[in-house]
Amino acid sequence: MRKIAIYGKGGIGKSTTTQNTVAGLAEMGKKVMVVGCDPKADSTRLLLHGLAQKTVLDTLREEGEDVELDDILKEGYGGTMCTESGGPEPGVGCAGRGIITSINLLEQLGAYEEDKKLDYVFYDVLGDVVCGGFAMPIRDGKAEEIYIVCSGEMMAMYAANNICKGIVKYADTGGVRLGGIICNSRKVDFEKEMIEELCRQIGTQMIHFMPRENQVQRAEINRKTVIDYSPEHAQADEYRALAKKIDENKMLVIPKPLEIAQLEKLLVDFGIAN
């Protein structure tokens, strides 16, 4: 079983990318579980066709300790298993703790047992790794491969670099490695070349360049992944290609994060900062 976490700046398209890629893996016959690690609880919406899933934390609050796996794990598109950790009420408590509680509960209830025959577990994790709870999938060895969703915008690259620092911090203890950067295009000038250069300097690969396409939004409005909503569309093939690349990926590295000056120089070199 491969344990993968998807990180990236808030709003970059992690949940969309994760669900569409998972749909591609499911189409290939892979058994996948998706664990949403975001208080918004939107990491499985497209796989479940818009069913607002009751989160692990909500279930615990309402049911107490008497929780069954079926209460928190729902089957979605292509036989994918979906769960959302959820979070505390706004303004109260720590969302990072929610992730820790949820993953521990899933383990206790046997979600990862061999009889489940899982090929993949995907953790879709909120934003930057600035809070210890959100770093938990990296820190405790729950995730072994990290893919960062990025774009050619400065803050997305800054966040990607920060996440690499988090990977370095826990590479020895948790055994986590960076599998690559997924460029989710925002149509910035020289975006592909810039992210390729960022990857080269960090010591990783741009595993896929995902073009910007309105079909993704159309599918989302219909509460589906692109592969589910319009399987013949070119964008569905892009997600299939990404799924195949992840499935075949052997390049797992400890990244070399850049200094801020190096990151800014990269932006200047490609004319973004002018």
Curated annotation (Swiss-Prot):
**InterPro entries linked:** NifH/chlL_CS, NifH/frxC, Nitrogenase_Fe_NifH, P-loop_NTPase
- Keyword Nucleotide-binding belongs to the record: yes
EC number(s) for this protein? 1.18.6.1
Positions that bind [4Fe-4S] cluster: 94, 131
Residues recorded with modification ADP-ribosylarginine: 97
User: What is the name of this protein?
Assistant: Nitrogenase iron protein
The coenzyme or cofactor needed here is: [4Fe-4S] cluster
Q: What does UniProt give as the signal peptide span?
A: none
Q: How is it modified after translation?
A: The reversible ADP-ribosylation of Arg-97 inactivates the nitrogenase reductase and regulates nitrogenase activity.
Name of the coding gene: nifH
Q: Which UniProt key words apply to this protein? A: 4Fe-4S, ADP-ribosylation, ATP-binding, Iron, Iron-sulfur, Metal-binding, Nitrogen fixation, Nucleotide-binding, Oxidoreductase
Amino-acid positions noted as binding ATP in the UniProt annotation, renumbered to this chain: 8-15
Family in the record:
Belongs to the NifH/BchL/ChlL family.
Its EC top class is: oxidoreductase
One GO BP annotation here?
nitrogen fixation
The protein's role, per its UniProt record: The key enzymatic reactions in nitrogen fixation are catalyzed by the nitrogenase complex, which has 2 components: the iron protein and the molybdenum-iron protein.
Q: How is the cofactor bound?
A: Binds 1 [4Fe-4S] cluster per dimer.
Quaternary arrangement and interactors, per the entry?
A: Homodimer.
